[in-house]
A protein has these predicted regions:
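Middle-to-C-terminal accessory/interaction subdomains
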Residues: 68-70, 134, 268-334, 342-490
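Phosphate-handling architecture centered on phosphoinositide signaling
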Residues: 2-313, 435, 445, 452-484
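Short glycine-rich loop/turn motifs
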Residues: 138, 335-337
Length: 490
């Protein structure tokens, strides 16, 4: 109750403050494109007739020729759809050949009939784990050459050219902005976080609502993770891994030390390099290389030079990942949708993903803001035993609370993004408005019944969470105290 009163008082104070200059807080170390800061807000076209779609957001027009996009859950005889059975195309494929047109004018508004600024043949499917069960589908898009014979890198909505994209449709997140906001803030402080752009989507001419075009976690010669590309002469290579539910491509699935030694029930798969570079020998080398890191992390020498964990892992990356996911109580991190990568010439780093359920937006149970949790997850279990790591977390948290994680900055960011989206929010809920009456979170009192209430709820959570962490961040020291870790030390 104490922190709720503090949060309410802070919210009231923020309403009295003038708009925060967001750009003053943004860093030069990791320059980041924030769409809502760079693109003008909506002003009606002179010829706008009130019926034709006219928007300042990019338009993504997907044409499947009337064919259904595969990947939709199939209910069984008892109408149970959580059975890992999904639709395919008529020929049994998990991907559908289609086309995409993008209308994204640098100035002025966009309309479906405008000349496209980008066109491409694509393969498309419904994507997501729990999110694929939502009525509003998210999609995986692979861009192809005109004949469909090979992948094609395209600069989608101004992002680095690549051939794979996640088109995220906010559904459970009634603010519509969680992924956009937290990916961008992560990109300000970490070496890489997926770039994102709001857009509005039409599927076969039918309006689908507000979406977020998102970079998938991968690497190109000069894109995304920007890892050193594989050499033909050696099995040693840069790689990116995902801790989740595994891949449908068996050569990408690997078993590492934490799985067989710690009985970790999640699967690890290789998301980079792509299949054309990934021989069984290289997959085996990656599994062994990463297992060697995990073994060193779980050894008696985990915090002792020259074998200490930070000799192989970038401490600042692991610290920032911990703080962002703890601050937002994004507790899929560390066991689902968890990405870790290493350049063949460098150290392990973390990459954020999926804040759709962050800030107390899990279907159940309630995410109370008065606790820490990541210290129990696989790699952070050992990192949290190291005083250097815990001290770095505490110092970095206090630094970020003076800027990007301050109450003023976070609330102003939410307000500015929401204001910039403008009528696109109303258009989205003209299709998905029933979700505002639908109780998707449990217990029922957690469900906001308007977009404004959803944004206010996220503000309240961030302020309450920040107030609690400000007062209690030092309790993390208990996990690195000698009395708790005698058996792990020399």
């Amino acid at each position: 109750m104490k922190y709720k009163r503090m949060a309410l008082a802070a919210c009231a104070l923020l309403l009295l403050l003038s708009a925060t200059n967001l750009s003053a807080v943004l860093t030069d170390e990791h320059p980041r494109y924030h769409q809502h800061l760079e693109r003008p807000a909506y002003t009606p076209c002179a010829e706008y007739d009130g019926e034709t779609l006219c928007t300042h957001l990019p338009l993504v027009l997907i044409d499947t020729g009337g064919e259904a996009i595969p990947g939709v859950p199939i209910p069984d005889a008892d109408s149970n759809i959580e059975n890992d059975r999904f639709t395919t195309t008529a020929d049994g494929s998990t991907l559908l050949r289609a086309s995409v047109s993008v209308v994204d004018h640098a100035e002025g508004n966009n309309h479906p009939a405008d000349a496209p600024t980008l066109q491409s043949v694509i393969d498309i499917r419904v994507r997501g784990n729990s999110s694929r069960y939502f009525d509003k589908h998210s999609y995986l898009i692979k861009t192809l050459t005109d004949d469909g014979a090979a992948s094609r890198d395209v600069a989608m909505l101004g992002m680095d050219a690549f051939d794979e994209w996640a088109l995220h449709g906010p559904y459970l997140d009634k603010t519509l902005i969680r992924n956009y906001m937290w990916y961008n803030l992560a990109g300000e402080i970490m070496d890489y976080a997926p770039n994102v752009r709001f857009c509005e989507v039409l599927l076969n001419g039918v309006y689908q609502g507000l979406y977020v075009m998102t970079e998938t976690v991968s690497s190109g010669a000069d894109a995304r993770l920007k890892l050193t590309e594989p050499s033909k002469d050696t099995v040693q290579m840069s790689y990116a891994l995902r801790l989740d539910r595994g891949s449908g491509n068996e050569v990408k699935n690997i078993e590492t030390f934490s799985q067989y030694a710690l009985r970790n029930l999640q699967d690890m798969d290789i998301v980079y390099p792509e299949t054309k570079w990934l021989t069984p020998e290289r997959a085996a080398w990656i599994a062994q290389d990463f297992s060697d890191f995990e073994k060193s992390l779980y050894s008696y020498d985990y915090d002792t030079e020259p074998y200490a964990w930070w000799e192989q892992a970038d401490m600042s990356s692991f610290v920032d990942y911990f703080i962002l996911n703890e601050f937002t109580c994004n507790y899929d991190a560390g066991w689902l949708s968890t990405y870790i990568y290493r350049d063949v010439r460098g150290k392990y780093k973390m990459c954020i993903w999926d804040f759709n359920s962050a800030c107390d937006n899990y279907s159940h149970p309630v995410t109370e803001p008065q606790h820490f949790e990541l210290q129990y997850n696989v790699w952070y279990y050992m990192l949290s035993k190291d005083e250097k790591f815990i001290n770095a977390v505490i110092d970095r948290y206090r630094e970020l609370r003076q800027g990007i994680l301050s109450d003023e900055y976070l609330c102003a960011y939410m307000d500015d993004v929401t204001a910039w989206l403008g009528d696109a929010v109303e258009r989205n809920f003209s299709v998905w408005g029933y979700t505002l009456e639908k109780d998707m979170l449990s217990p029922a009192w957690r469900n906001p019944h308007s977009h404004a209430a959803a944004v206010a709820q996220m503000k309240h959570f961030c302020i309450e969470r920040g107030a609690w962490m400000d007062e209690n961040i030092d309790i993390l020291r208990q996990y690195s105290h000698e009395s708790k870790n005698k058996k792990f030390n020399h």
